[in-house]
């Protein structure tokens, strides 16, 4: 459960991401594909090379979904229901991949905002991404 402090930390951190959200989403995806090559199996039709338009576009989708989630911290299941259905029933993404991408997103945010990435902010963002991952995998059952 996200505390009031967590919610404040998440909103403040995401405000700093701002216009860079799509760029950071793409960077986190590239980091995921490089660090965990098995994640590439879900994107056989993508050009996965550095800077590819397809990775940038999907990174923006990821970032937009997270921006939506940040705006609905009190109702993540409702805000992410359609994405949960898509990933569970159509795409059939292995749930572990959400954790891998979450880790890579935290690394990306820490690299770009080292002074703002305090232990408290790190913990809040980690809880947020874990909650988002749980919501996205809730329809798998």
UniProtKB/Swiss-Prot annotation:
GO biological process, one term: hydrogen peroxide catabolic process
Domain (Globin): residue spans on this chain: 1-141
Modified residues (Phosphoserine): 3, 35, 49, 102, 124, 138
InterPro entries: Globin, Globin-like_sf, Globin/Proto, Hemoglobin_a-typ, Hemoglobin_oxygen_transport, Hemoglobin_pi
Annotated positions of the N6-acetyllysine modification: 16
PTM sites of type Phosphotyrosine: 24
N6-succinyllysine carried by residues: 7, 11, 16, 40
PROSITE patterns for this protein: GLOBIN
Molecular function (Gene Ontology), one example: peroxidase activity
GO cellular component: blood microparticle; haptoglobin-hemoglobin complex; hemoglobin complex
Coiled-coil regions listed in the entry: none
Protein residues bound to O2: 58
Modified residues (Phosphothreonine): 108, 134, 137
Record-listed heme b binding positions: 87
Keywords: Acetylation, Heme, Iron, Metal-binding, Oxygen transport, Phosphoprotein, Transport
Tissues expressed in: Red blood cells.
Claim: Iron is one of the keywords in the record: yes
Superkingdom per UniProt: Eukaryota
Record function comment: Involved in oxygen transport from the lung to the various peripheral tissues.
Stated family: Belongs to the globin family.
Record text on subunit structure and interactions: Heterotetramer of two alpha chains and two beta chains.
Protein name per the record: Hemoglobin subunit alpha
Naturally occurring in which organism (per UniProt): Talpa europaea
């Amino acid at each position: 459960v996200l505390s009031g402090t967590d919610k404040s930390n998440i909103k403040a951190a995401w405000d700093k991401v701002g216009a860079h959200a799509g760029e950071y989403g793409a960077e986190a995806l590239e980091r995921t594909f490089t660090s965990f090559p098995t994640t590439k199996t879900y994107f056989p039709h993508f050009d996965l090379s550095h800077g590819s338009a397809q990775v940038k576009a999907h990174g923006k989708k990821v970032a937009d979904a997270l921006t939506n989630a940040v705006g609905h911290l009190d109702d993540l299941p409702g805000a992410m229901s359609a994405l949960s259905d898509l990933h569970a029933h159509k795409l059939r993404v292995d749930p572990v991949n959400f954790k891998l991408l979450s880790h890579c997103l935290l690394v990306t945010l820490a690299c770009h905002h080292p002074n703002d990435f305090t232990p408290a902010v790190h913990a809040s963002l980690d809880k947020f991404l874990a909650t988002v991952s749980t919501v996205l995998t809730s329809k798998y059952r």
